[in-house]
Amino acid sequence: MSLFWRGFALIVFTIVSFASVAAERPKIALVLSGGGAKGSAHIGVLKVLEEKRIPIDMVVGTSMGSYVAGLYAMGLSAEEVEQITLNIDWNKGYNDRVSRDALSLRQKQQDELYQLRTDIGISGGTVKSPDGFFRGQAMAALLRDATSNLKVQKSFDELPIPYRAVATDMETVTPFVLDHGSLAKAMQASMSIQGILKPVEWEGRILADGGAVNNMPVDVAKAMGADVVIAVDIGARLRDKSELTSGLAMLDQMTTYMTQVGTERQKALLTDRDILITPAFGNMGIADFDRIPEGVKYGEEAAKRVALSLDALSLSPARYKAYRDQKLSRRAQNSALPAYYIDRVEIVNNSSLADETIRSAMRVKPHKVQTREGLEAGVRRLYALESFDRVTYQIEERGAENVLVVDAHEKNWGPGYLNFQFGFTDDFESSSNYNVGASYTRTNINEWGGEWHNEVSLGTWKHLKTEFYSPLDPSQTYFGQISLGYDKETRRLYLTEEGALRRSRDSGQTYYFDSQYAFWSSEGSLGWNIRPWQRASLGISAMTGDISIDGIGISDVSTSAWGPFLRLEHDTLDSRYFPYSGFLFQGQLGYMRVNQDNGEWATARSRGSSYEVSLVKPWSWERHSLNLMLGAGGTQTNEPLPLFAQDLGGMFNLSGFQPHELSGRYRLFGGLRYIYRLADNDFGAFRLPLFVGGSLEQGGVWDQGHDIRFATSHTAGSLYIGSETFLGPVFLGIGAAEEGREAIYLQIGSTFH
């Protein structure tokens, strides 16, 4: 017989033999139910199945079960699934807030003043809210990472193990079986808990967590052709009478009951050949993701309790090796890659922004290799524009091309958004300040992301502002802005016995008077966003209004000023109030013409340059941070009542003195601030870290440049405890300075100015 025919006969014999072996055993399906963190028990079951050499021919899951099933369907071992799951910070999946380092400089500054980010929308005069407590953006990124962002599948039958996920079609409230597409997106659809995570749009359907309608989809496995079903039930138990103590408990009881009714219907489909595994979890709950190793053990224990039934499905070592080799071969043919050559980029633009603006934020171009890390960074940049409800991407094979599809959905409860402000400070002696306010931002008024931003604040400081801001190109590199505002504040002027502003340690006895500043102001500028966190702007500002000082007969001093300015800003701090990394620089150089007249003086006119610089640089190690703080300012204008006076006083700004207590034409300040993170208090959806620390400060103010010297500056320091909360920063501290000065400070919420 020729060599050709011998080879042909061998191939035919191998195929027939393999088919014969496959035909000798039943097709086994693994069905994994939903149950949050308790889904880790599925991994324990997988471990036992592998130990017993039980082949899985198809895998079906709901909710958390769809996640474990999906990873196993990729051809991963139980140990690999466990390692990936342990490495995931599941709490991050429920935190869609854009981190500070991803925000633009403009967004950071708005957040500092109007820190209560409610995400309330205004559209057509109607108040709207999101359709889910969390957007699912972070969860999508988490699942893409877990699956290595596997390419879109024409059919989940092409995976090493055929796979199905079950979700709820929210329009009909019926089960929907996902059998193709993006694996990560299918998992997310099955896991998006109603009212908690935003539903997933899938080919015209609105899909959410499948647990409510089919938490243990035995019927799906049977429809796929399974001869034997191994089903794992991790569903919640009904509460007993003693636990039904609240309305939420009652609601949870009804939800659990409806889920159990569906599960019982699925159990009724099981035959004598099928195997049901029911882990016991003790007091482990669906949100206990920190107890995943414990859940894995519960799954192993439950699987071992049905060991005799499982043993009947065990293969010989040789046959199991053949099964495993075949699975690994299919995995190699359909595996995720760390980078892809992108032939074409397709933008599915469901927003009012231009396609080019989206492309620019993503920084993706066709005919280039794109890494997964680069694509994820692009998604974060686009989402950080805060115009989008959800931004996703997937890589599709279309013929010989790899097509990157970016799907960007604008928030459907905008395009106007409300945020709020609350701030309170008290020194427990003679001064307390408060402010409440709101901002309204109408976003995307043009296709490049222009905004109409408005602010109102009432309290110690009364503030109104309206501003138009617009990028001048699709990449948002250049911008123009114009604003009009009104401010009225009560400010204390500290005067010496001679009636001069208090400046140095030699000022002698000091008195303070409440002064009223009421001014209209306007500003127009053109700028360059060098980086999202760095910009330069050139413009003109003007202001006009009155100054009055109570107690000394000065009232309605008419004051006006105008002039050009150059402003440079850089902010990469990870936190504005408790920074551990990054760098902050703010600098402005201007030239102002000032007129001042109260009807009794001859009109006082002055002109001159002004400058202002501040810098913060943190260095950190472990839970410690040391911040360098530097500041300087000066003005050459010489109006009788201070308009651009350089001030010191207040916490971390010569602690021990009152705010604005030291005032002059020139200011120098330097300090070191120590921060220790005492507790993280990370609850996933929000954090409430606790800090303690202290500061050492040196600074002074002077009227003449040649008077600036260390001998007339002040030494000060502070000790404090603080936290970052949903209200903003909270500080309680004590400050002390030379001359026996002491002050207690309480600050809650946004700072003033």
Regions found by a protein language model. Give the residues of each.
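Patatin-like phospholipase
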Residues: A22-T62, G70-E397, K411-N412
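N-terminal signal peptide c-region/cleavage motif recognized by signal peptidases
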Residues: S17-S20
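Bacterial N-terminal signal peptides that target proteins for export
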Residues: M1-F8
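C-terminal outer-membrane beta-barrel translocator/porin domains of Gram-negative envelope proteins
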Residues: V403-V405, Y417-D427, A561-L690, L696, ...
